């Protein structure tokens, strides 16, 4: 061998030795792959709430023809098993298995999938073929004796399951018993149930564990009502035209009305001091006149303070405590707007100029979302002093928690670093697990989804702009299935920022349609005050209310809401929601096709393990989407939630009661509906399956 050949050969051997074997995860004896749900490769917790079932899926298979079984298992933070359910093949041929787990207490949990070789199922499959054919009958029952004796060791003494297996074993062991008698004993319903409850397991395999965080129920279910405290009780002098602001105490007097409509969360915009520099006037004008209160989102003043202070015209912390206390007395929680931005007058601007972005000319950059400009707001720069900003914001949030705030509606979280939220929400999950954060993030789907992944409990959604049947159907399926493990939706027909063309043009009927869809389509929904007065006039060229409350006082006469019936409808919807667990659930939604593109229908279900009486609760919703004209349609019911099939003669299979009108109907699988936007625009139907 030449010197060159020797060097080349040595180099090749050295190269082979230096290449490390690739990392891999060993496949278990019974392969368990593609486990869901999981987030960030199983490092971030998926979402659930107390008594809310969630589905676990996995692809499970094995070599050969022997049978296997699987269970989904939920363990609490201490490692104790709190739920364990069999998994069923939901995609025959694809070996996709599913089981629904139901946590009962809040806090960190983990789930895993366990699979095993099932000798009883394998034996039974073989026996049902061999015994009738007279093949190896003696051997078949000899195997059964061994199997049933092993099963006896795993069943509790004096249990019904043990008795069933023992009795079957007695028959199987009789030498003179007929083979068909032995087989009948071995496959009786009692024996099958015993092996299901206490299976004989071989080749037990487990997936890795995946984290779940179980929140309190309000993280999933809530009826929100937004009001501006400064508008409630605001008065205007008839001679001078000067306004006197409403206060937190006058706003507290309005809470009885809100609670009377069935709302359980009262949401208020920022109550902090409002800056004077570049203060916005009415309808977002650049010039404010004396008496204009400014935008509550331009937070901070030299004299009164910043995020840890209260706008003097609203009152004091004592007044805030009165407001919160009254809300709690009425069974409502208070959600406070958390807007991480500053007016030019905010104390942080002078104390921490590094927390803002400086332009080349030395001025501070104000907020922009081209073509929109917010000259009265400075956005924070989270990169210059991230630790300093983090500590201060956490201090501020904890201050308001100490004053009884349990929910924060976070303004534009998508304009702040995701890592900031991940840290803040993780620490609050440990230190203040009762506190809920809603993301007001009308932004791109990846950002919305990731904000949910890192810990936001709820999110505003695109529901506001989903008006057509197909849009609504697709969006309901998206939020209830595809994204339910990471993002909980909140459906709002309008907000103080958004007034859609559909609401602008459709009048009372449009408002009713959207309220019904919001209240039934999502466990959390919300109404911005004035909705019950049909405030639907937009500022020209904008999708927001004219004379917007963000820039002026807006006292209202709510007696008018009784005349148009909207307050009655909102009250009815909240009452129906409180009565039906199905409307308090997100994941079990199915679409019912209809023969009319202007009529949408869907079914929502609460599983038996989610209800107090252990009986499935189901609601069918049918809505006319046309605010101008009556529509009729045939509704083609998806019967899978009820586990029933159509009758051979087309006769009725369910009894439905309209929770809005009180009328009861007998329906087959394809009922006819007629809905009038000026009368009954929708059906919200409870369901009873006919025997």
Curated annotation (Swiss-Prot):
The annotated active site, in chain numbering, is 411 (nucleophile), 440 (proton donor)
Q: Where is this site: Transition state stabilizer?
A: 497
Concerning InterPro entries, the annotation shows: GlgE, GLGE_C, GlgE_dom_N/S, Glyco_hydro_13_cat_dom, Glyco_hydro_b, Glycoside_hydrolase_SF, Ig-like_fold
> SMART domains annotated for this entry?
Aamy
The answer to keyword Transferase applying to this record is: yes
UniProt binding sites for alpha-maltose 1-phosphate = 280, 341, 376, 412, 550-551
Entries under Gene3D superfamilies matching the protein: Glycosidases, Golgi alpha-mannosidase II, Immunoglobulins, Phosphotransferase system, lactose/cellobiose-type IIA subunit
Please identify the protein, giving its name as recorded: Alpha-1,4-glucan:maltose-1-phosphate maltosyltransferase
Which species expresses this protein natively? Arcanobacterium haemolyticum (strain ATCC 9345 / DSM 20595 / CCM 5947 / CCUG 17215 / LMG 16163 / NBRC 15585 / NCTC 8452 / 11018)
**Gene it is expressed from:** glgE
């Amino acid at each position: 061998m030449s010197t060159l050949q020797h060097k080349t050969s040595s180099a090749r051997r050295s190269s082979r030795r230096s290449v490390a074997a690739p990392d891999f995860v060993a496949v278990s004896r019974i392969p368990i792959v593609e486990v869901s749900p999981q987030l960030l490769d199983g490092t971030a917790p998926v979402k659930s709430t107390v008594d809310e079932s969630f589905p676990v899926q996995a692809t499970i298979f094995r070599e050969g023809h022997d049978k296997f079984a699987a269970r989904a298992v939920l363990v609490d933070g201490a490692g104790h098993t709190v739920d364990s359910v069999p998994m069923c093949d939901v995609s025959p041929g694809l070996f996709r298995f599913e089981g629904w787990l139901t946590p009962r207490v809040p806090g960190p949990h983990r789930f895993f999938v366990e699979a095993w070789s099932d000798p009883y199922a394998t034996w039974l499959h073989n026996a049902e073929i061999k015994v009738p054919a007279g093949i190896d009958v003696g051997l078949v029952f000899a195997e059964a004796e061994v199997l049933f004796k092993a099963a006896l060791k795993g069943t509790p003494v004096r249990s019904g399951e043990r008795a069933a297996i023992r009795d079957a074993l007695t028959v199987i062991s009789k030498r003179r018993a007929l083979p068909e008698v032995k087989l009948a004993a071995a496959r009786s319903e009692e024996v099958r149930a015993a092996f299901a409850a206490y299976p004989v397991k071989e080749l037990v395999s487990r997936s890795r564990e995946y984290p779940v965080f179980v929140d309190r129920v309000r993280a999933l279910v809530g009826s929100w009502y937004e009001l501006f405290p400064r508008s409630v009780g605001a008065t205007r002098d008839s001679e001078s035209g000067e306004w006197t602001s409403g206060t937190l105490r006058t706003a507290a007097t309005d809470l009885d009305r809100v609670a009377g409509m069935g709302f359980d969360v009262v949401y208020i915009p920022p109550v902090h001091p409002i800056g004077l520099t570049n203060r916005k006037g009415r309808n977002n004008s650049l010039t404010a006149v004396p008496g204009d209160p400014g935008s509550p989102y331009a937070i901070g003043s030299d004299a009164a303070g910043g995020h840890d202070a209260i706008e003097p015209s609203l009152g004091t912390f004592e007044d805030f405590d009165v407001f919160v206390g009254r809300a709690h007395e009425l069974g409502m929680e208070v959600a406070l707007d958390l807007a991480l931005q500053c007016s030019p007058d905010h104390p942080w601007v002078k104390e921490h100029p590094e927390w803002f972005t400086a332009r080349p000319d030395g001025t501070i950059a104000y907020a922009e979302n081209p073509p929109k400009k917010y000259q009265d707001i400075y956005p924070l720069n989270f990169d210059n002093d991230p630790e300093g900003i983090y500590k201060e914001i956490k201090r501020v949030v904890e201050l308001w928690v100490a004053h009884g705030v349990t929910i924060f509606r976070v303004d534009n979280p998508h304009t702040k670093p995701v890592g900031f939220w991940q840290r803040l929400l993780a620490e609050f999950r440990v230190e203040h697990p009762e506190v809920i954060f809603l993301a007001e993030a009308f932004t791109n789907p990846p950002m919305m989804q990731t904000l949910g992944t890192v810990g936001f409990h709820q999110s505003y959604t695109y529901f506001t702009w989903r008006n057509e049947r197909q849009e609504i159907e697709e969006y309901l399926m998206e939020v209830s299935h595809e994204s339910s493990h990471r993002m909980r939706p909140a459906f709002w027909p309008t907000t103080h920022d958004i007034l859609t063309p559909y609401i602008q043009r459709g009048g009372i009927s449009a408002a009713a349609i959207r309220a019904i869809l919001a209240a039934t389509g999502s466990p959390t929904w919300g109404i911005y005050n004035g909705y019950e007065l049909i405030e639907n006039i937009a500022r020209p060229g904008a999708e927001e209310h004219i004379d917007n409350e963000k820039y002026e006082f807006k006292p209202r006469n709510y007696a008018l809401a009784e005349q148009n019936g909207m307050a009655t409808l909102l009250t009815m919807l909240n009452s129906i929601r409180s009565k039906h667990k199905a409307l308090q659930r997100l994941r079990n939604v199915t679409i019912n096709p209809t023969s009319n593109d202007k009529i949408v229908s869907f079914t929502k279900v609460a599983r038996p393990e989610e209800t107090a009486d252990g009986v499935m609760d189901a609601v069918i919703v049918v809505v006319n989407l046309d605010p101008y004209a009556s529509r009729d349609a045939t509704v083609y019911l998806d019967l899978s939630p009820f586990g029933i099939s159509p009758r051979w003669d087309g006769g009725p299979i369910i009894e439905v009661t309209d929770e809005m009108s009180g009328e009861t109907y007998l329906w087959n699988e394809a009922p006819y509906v007629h809905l009038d936007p000026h009368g009954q625009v929708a059906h919200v139907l409870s369901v009873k399956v006919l025997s």
